[in-house]
Amino acid sequence: MSRVYNFSAGPAVLPEEVLNEAAAEMLDYRGTGMSVMEMSHRSKSYETIIEDAESDLRDLLHIPENYKVLFLQGGGSTQFAMVPMNLMKNRVADYIITGQWAKKAHKEASIYGKANAIASSADKTFSYIPDCSDLPVSEDADYVYICENNTIYGTKFWTLPNT
């Protein structure tokens, strides 16, 4: 088999070693006699997977113990609703619209309250990150939303706005 390179915005090419290990463990995960897909989410084996994943994330991202790590189903689109549902206490949030993902998040947030577009690069098809040095942040905004890395348009915040 000839391996291909994948330059799409979504999943990337994985090393063959990783794929081979995953294939082997598909039938027998670390000597348990079953695949992870067959395990009870209450089993000790599965709990160990989650505990190790949380520990690795905390180490990699320097997440302090006073923060919770949540493993949630759904992708980015699900988060567009979860963010305002959980953070929009005053029913006001500010959005910096820099691409399709931020645009979708802004639209979803408007269902739950007032979602202000305080900066945007829609005028030039999201080909740049707008100047965020003097943002008109709403006094009553519960949060300011950005999509840091716009995979569709190839733009990225290199420094986060001071909000």
Regions inferred by a protein language model and the residue ranges of each:
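A glycine-/small-polar-enriched, mobile loop at the entrance of the PLP active site in fold-type I
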Residues: 3-54
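Active-site phosphate-binding strand-loop segment of PLP-dependent enzymes
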Residues: 10, 109, 121-163
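Conserved N-terminal alpha-helix of the aminotransferase class I/II PLP-enzyme fold
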Residues: 34-79, 100, 108
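Glycine-rich loop at the start of a catalytic domain that most often binds anionic cofactors/ligands
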Residues: 82-88
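Active-site-proximal loop->helix
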Residues: 86, 104-113
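Conserved PLP-anchoring active-site segment centered on the Schiff-base-forming lysine
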Residues: 88-103
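A glycine-rich helix N-cap at a beta->alpha junction
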Residues: 113-121
